[in-house]
Swiss-Prot record:
UniProt main location, coarse: cytoplasm
GO biological process: methanogenesis
Keyword vocabulary terms for this entry: Cytoplasm, Metal-binding, Methanogenesis, Methylation, Nickel, Transferase
Cofactors, names only: coenzyme F430
Amino-acid positions noted as binding coenzyme B in the UniProt annotation, renumbered to this chain: R228, K259, H260, R273
Family annotation (Pfam families): MCR_alpha (PF02249), MCR_alpha_N (PF02745)
Protein name in the entry: Methyl-coenzyme M reductase subunit alpha
Origin species: Methanothermus fervidus
Disulfide bridge partners, by residue number: none
Amino acid sequence: MAEERKKLFVDALRKKFKEEPKERKTTFYTLGGWKQSERKKEFVEYGKKVAKERGIPAYNPDIGTPLGQRVLMPYQVSTTDTFVEGDDLHFVNNLAMQQFWDDIRRTVIVGLNHAHRILERSLGKEVTPETINHYLETVNHAMPGAAVVQEHMVETHPGLTADSYVKVFTGNDELADEIESCYLIDINKQFPEHQAEQLKKAIGHTIWQAVRIPTIVSRTCDGATTSRWSAMQIGMSMISAYKQAAGEAATADFAYAAKHAEVIHLGTFLPVRRARGENELGGVPFGFLADIVQSSRVHYEDPVRVALDVVASGAMLYDQIWLGSYMSGGVGFTQYATASYTDNILDDFTYYGKEYVEDKYGGLAEAPHDFDTILDVATEVTLYSLDQYEEYPTLMEDHFGGSQRAAIAAAASGCSTAFAAGNAQAGLSGWYLSQILHKECHARLGFYGYDLQDQCGAANTYSIRSDEGLPAELRGPNYPNYAMNVGHLGEYAGIVQAAHIARGDADSLNPLVKVAFADDNLPFDWTNPRGEFAKGALREFEPEGERDLIRPAGK
């Protein structure tokens, strides 16, 4: 089958290196150094300007290792025709990547069900679609930082907080029909019918708020601020909309409901040694990330696209921002991430695996749940992947680090195994097996300790104990063995998504999270993360949370 397929990465390699991908001889030191990069030339000019203005030397690529001894590679963002410079895929230089994380950190999901019970049972108030709509009008005034109950309160400028709002969703079609459309995330409109039915059944007659606090607030403070900011404005809006006395005992019940009882944080609290609160990156489980990304409701007939959109999202979020900056403070982690979402390489390997699974087992999620399936699929895809690196020297240069190659071969193997079994734990086993096979073939994978979690992971894939094993959907960067090994976390999230899209599931872990991000008012297009990263690299992405309104005039 391998000989009959058109390799998806060949065109990208040809354009990157301007030589035939199978060519085994090349040249060095003749490409112009850093001047071959338009972005580096721009950096140099800005570095001179900064140094002149501040009186302290700034960017100078002639310091340190000479850049550009070989091709300073451009990258084709997979699923797009866009080639970009590597520097533009660093999250500091990419507004789309920043907004990706902003949109997660500033979101909290809060139920209205407990609050409605308090209103009806404790206060004797009537809750109707009309009162819910009135409350939603009130809370959309208040959530950006406006006053509703107290006088002489300072307020935020709506031009600075225009990205802050509240919408609701429910599995009850009759109730949804009564909610004003501007406040509603309509499950029937946003999801294909088979997914909408699953989600509505799971959510039932409950009603939930998708709260977006202002980007500028979560950036200035932290993720743990999100639920507190949300709860304060929700509480004040409830008092105003339902004409309560602010000091009565039920106010405490509303505060508890809005802060604790029906609150879904998108990130869990981290241990003291990592010192982060809720809604911070290290606490975002893989299953939540798979649900946040919305590719599955648009591209559900292309399971590889769906799984790899999650891989790309996780590689950027977990590798570039969490491990690359929160945890290590480094710059080079970007290259680990780009390997998984550029040049159609992982796409090629994973489509090969999917086709193999379909040919061998007659479809996705049809293979037996046993070790023979894991051994078969992971071995086949790993050997195919390693063969490509041997056959195409430019592919080897593209993924110049052994740990990059290990991550990509294992990601394709893990996703393919998850496709076969429809089970994320099986996919994890496929990943671990691929790493061990790869090390057997090449003697090493990458930098020292890269495969630490892979060597011990096989022993606890099916051990469901608090610090040794969890269902893959519930694992995340906070899982002990995954604390500091780059080139793993995003791929694990993709393996989770691969299992659930193979089964035809509408969500991977939490239907509330899936629906909360099916929201067209969000600035980031969650159905197309790789396309958005490309827009950010081209400087075509429009972010939220900007401060131009309060800058000095003329600046």
